[in-house]
């Protein structure tokens, strides 16, 4: 899994909890700039019990003609400095489906249990 952190801020024990409103606003920023098919929140903020040190984990479903790593970097670089860490994964729908069909437990869990924050056309 390739991720990139947009974190610029305090140590985890000094951070405050991140509201869903803040997370949705972040997803909307990404959606406006990159027009993804979907943005899915996963990890402790989606299906766990986040604490003050929890990061925000996002799967951005979109075509990645420049490659997944470059796409992740472009998304991360577009974000303003944040007081929390954001881990972004960018995958095309075809890649997600192919990986799920080949037994990728991680992507199965993310697409099954994650919270869709943005869906194009909805």
Regions found by a protein language model. Name each.
Residues 1-38, 47-52, 62-122:
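Catalytic core of pol beta-like nucleotidyltransferases
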Residues 42-44:
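Glycine-rich beta-strand-to-loop/alpha-helix junction loops that act as flexible
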């Amino acid at each position: 899994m390739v991720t990139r952190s947009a974190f610029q801020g305090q140590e985890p024990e000094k951070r405050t909890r991140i509201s869903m409103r803040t997370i949705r606003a972040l997803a909307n920023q990404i959606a406006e700039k990159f027009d993804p098919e979907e943005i899915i929140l996963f990890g402790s903020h989606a299906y766990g019990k986040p604490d003050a040190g929890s990061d925000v984990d996002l799967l951005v479903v979109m075509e990645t003609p420049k490659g997944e790593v470059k796409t992740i970097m472009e998304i991360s670089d577009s974000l303003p400095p944040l007081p929390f860490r954001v881990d972004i994964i960018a995958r095309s729908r075809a890649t997600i489906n192919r990986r799920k069909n080949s037994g990728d437990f991680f992507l199965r869990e993310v697409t099954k249990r994650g919270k869709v924050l943005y869906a194009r056309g909805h």
